[in-house]
Amino acid sequence: MHTLVFLSTRQVLQCQPAACQALPLLPRELFPLLFKVAFMDKKTLVLRELVHTWPFPLLSFQQLLQECAHCSRALLQERLSTESMQAVILGLTARIHTQETEAGTQPLCRKHALRVLDMTGLLDDGVEQDPETMSMWDCTAAVARTCIAQQQGGTAEPGLSPVPVEIRVDLRVNRASYTFLREALQSSVASPLRLCCRDLRAEDLPMRNTVALLQLLDAGCLRRIDLRFNNLGLRGLSVIIPHVARFQHLASLRLHYVHGDSRQPSVDGEDNFRYFLAQMGRFMCLRELSMGSSLLSGRLDQLLSTLQRPLESLELAFCALLPEDLRFLAQSSHAAHLKKLDLSGNDLSGNQLTPFQGLLQAVATTLLHLELTECQLADAQLLATLPTLTRCASLRYLGLYGNPLSMAGLKELLRDSVVQAELRTVVHPFPVDCYEGLPWPPPASVLLEASINEEKFARVEAELHQLLLASGRAHVLWTTDIYGRLAADYFSL
């Protein structure tokens, strides 16, 4: 829905040269809406000039591109246009260049000079990008190259120095982009464009490069560190963790593939693990911890006991958890604060079921997001757990993909979950009824790879839809799509 003000603004921007000439005559209060309309409609000349002459200290994508009173479209929930993103960057460099070459004349009022360009919060769903949209990798590269070019091509003359602009971004780095991102961070220290990272995600980066990058980041800006596919091991983790622990205001730490055999621990392995635990105790503000695909069998108590404050998000996917790990978590101070819990890939079907049910009871008051993908939960286990599960009254998201559930089990879940008024999304498996010749119990790999009978599944979907309609729950999404943007990030809960 668009207001008359929005439609009038869109009309004003139809002729870009005229709109650019008119900008100095327009009230500054119109600039936020002008920015959103120009960004949405790819009015790149206007967009560049808007950034060039921005009259406020802050230009924030999260503020300007969300749903507003004049336009219900939230651009940050979409992939952003490459043309529009590049226009913003060009407008910023033009602004700095103007200040450098015309320093003595002060063409831009320093009282209202732009101080912060906040480009954080861009959609990063991991899906292959449209060539006309900018991924997080593209954004990282574009901003980094701009900082490098600005430092190499600076032409400031004696007199009034340019007003520094802090560029806040979420950075994504891998082996291919590491070198120029490191150069950009080094260059920005003495540049009028100061690169400031809010969330860092490093994928498959060598240990020494990870450390070098961490040493260049501003401890006051960083909110999240996410190290993916690095297969660190305890030895590698003991090298990296002190460099991570200096960010004592870090809110989210995501570490993956930290391997170490807890069943046959070596002396060095134990020393490295104790050192890791000691460093984890330095974080004062940690709210989210993810240790996906890390071997934590029987060690969860050691890990969680070192933390200074209760967690609100805990991801322990494929961590080979034991019953005692689940019992400890249920009795810990973390349970009463957890909003998000991911136990995917841990077998909850045997002697772990009762401790798991106890854990659900402990987190029922606060839990919003529960992920149980590939947990070997068949109908019997699900039905036994439903009385506890439905006590999670605030639950919004339930992930059950990859579990051997039948249509009967799914229907029972749907009926019982009617009492969960906040539930909005259920990611369910293809029912075992839709497969042919499944071994029993079916391994998760078989459920993920085997072909299903499309005709049978179409009937299942239709029946589930009718049950949702009959129960007045048509607004709840039941889906088998595990690749959509359905799982909420902790910071959006």
Swiss-Prot record:
It is found in: Cytoplasm. GO terms for cellular component: cytoplasm. Interacts with IKBKB; disrupts IKBKB-IKBKG interaction preventing I-kappa-B-kinase (IKK) core complex formation and leading to a decrease of IKBKB phosphorylation and NF-kappaB activation. Interacts with CHUK. The gene is Lrrc14. Keywords: Cytoplasm, Leucine-rich repeat, Repeat. PANTHER family: LEUCINE-RICH REPEAT-CONTAINING PROTEIN 14, SIMILAR TO PREFERENTIALLY EXPRESSED ANTIGEN IN MELANOMA-LIKE 3. LRR repeats lie at residues 111-146, 194-218, 219-246, 247-282, 283-307, 308-339, 340-360, 364-391, 392-416. InterPro entries: Leu-rich_rpt, LRR_dom_sf, PRAME_domain. This is Leucine-rich repeat-containing protein 14. The keyword Ligase does not apply. One of its GO terms (biological process) is negative regulation of NF-kappaB transcription factor activity.
